[in-house]
A protein has these predicted regions:
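Extreme N-terminal starter segment of soluble prokaryotic enzymes
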Residues: 1-5
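Small/polar loops that bind or transfer phosphate-bearing groups
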Residues: 6, 64-65, 227
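A short beta-strand submotif of the Rossmann-like class I SAM-dependent methyltransferase core
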Residues: 7, 27
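Conserved SAM/SAH-binding loop
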Residues: 8-12
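Class I S-adenosyl-L-methionine
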Residues: 17-19, 26, 36, 76-244
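Mobile active-site "lid"/loop adjacent to the S-adenosyl-L-methionine
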Residues: 29-46, 169
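Short strand-turn motif at the edge of the Rossmann-like AdoMet-binding core
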Residues: 29-30, 65-67, 205
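Conserved Class I SAM-dependent methyltransferase catalytic core
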Residues: 40-94, 107, 111-112
Length: 244
């Protein structure tokens, strides 16, 4: 089942996934906000029954959302809900309503877990460092980054020159394959944050297969489930092109 794309109802197909075998669930669930026939909210009780069974105790369940769906989602399992990220887009998704309401430039990403999840913070250099064109490199065992040559070979930049992740993530939108398509770099960021290489990620509403592509790009394994034949075919073609 690993690195497979499954076609069918996710509530049924997830029953075949072994208990505690998934390191991360990353899914763009249907929000129930469009006229698309597939955009029907999945019964939360049945969804959480499977999610909590198959996720590891320290596995993160990371779900994109938009209001009012986001509020329904959080309260559907408030006991393991932890916090949100905000995905800030480069353009609004409700421009036609600009004369009636504020322009909407964001979606939520809700994070759930039973016990402290894997968390690999992706550090960013402070703005002043970026202005000097110093690029960050991986930390050494003593907590420093080697980046600029000096008389001894390398100059060490300390952790104070870096900023821990903020709750607002800025990624450009991607379009053309699915009405609610998410950007691959955004999902790569989330996957790298909540898993390690070789871990197994489930997306039970795979859409255009963004999670699968992000897993391939970051050396993670995946299980993708998609109910609609059209998008099931798109996923297989997309992954085939990525791995050929």
């Amino acid at each position: 089942m690993i690195n497979k794309v499954l076609h069918g109802d996710c509530l049924e197909l997830m029953k075949d996934i072994p208990n505690g075998s998934i390191d991360m669930i990353l899914c763009d669930l249907p929000y129930g906000t469009t006229a698309c026939k597939w955009d029907v909210i999945i019964a939360f009780d049945k969804l959480w029954q499977q999610y909590e069974r198959i996720i590891k105790d320290n596995g993160a369940i990371v779900l994109t959302a938009s209001e009012p769906f986001a509020s329904y989602l959080r309260t559907s399992n408030i006991k393991i809900y932890k916090y949100d990220w905000i995905w800030e887009k480069e353009r609004p998704t409700n421009a036609l309503l600009a004369n009636k309401q504020v322009l909407k430039y964001h979606e939520m990403i809700c994070v759930f877990y039973k016990k402290q999840s894997v968390f690999n913070p992706i550090l960013r250099e402070r703005e002043e460092k970026n202005k000097r064109n110093n690029k960050a490199r991986p930390f050494t065992s003593n907590g420093y980054v080697n980046n600029v040559p000096n008389s001894q070979g390398m100059n060490q930049t300390g952790m104070n020159d870096f900023i821990k992740p903020k709750s607002i993530l800025k990624f450009n939108m991607e379009r053309g394959l699915h009405p609610t398509q998410k950007p691959v770099p955004l999902f790569e960021y989330l996957i790298k944050t909540y898993t390690n290489e070789g871990d197994l990620v489930l997306d039970n509403c795979a859409g255009s297969g963004t999670t699968g592509i992000a897993c391939i790009n970051t050396n993670r394994n995946y299980i993708l489930i998609e109910k609609e034949q059209k998008y099931f075919d798109i996923i297989n073609e997309r992954i085939g092109n990525q791995t050929s």
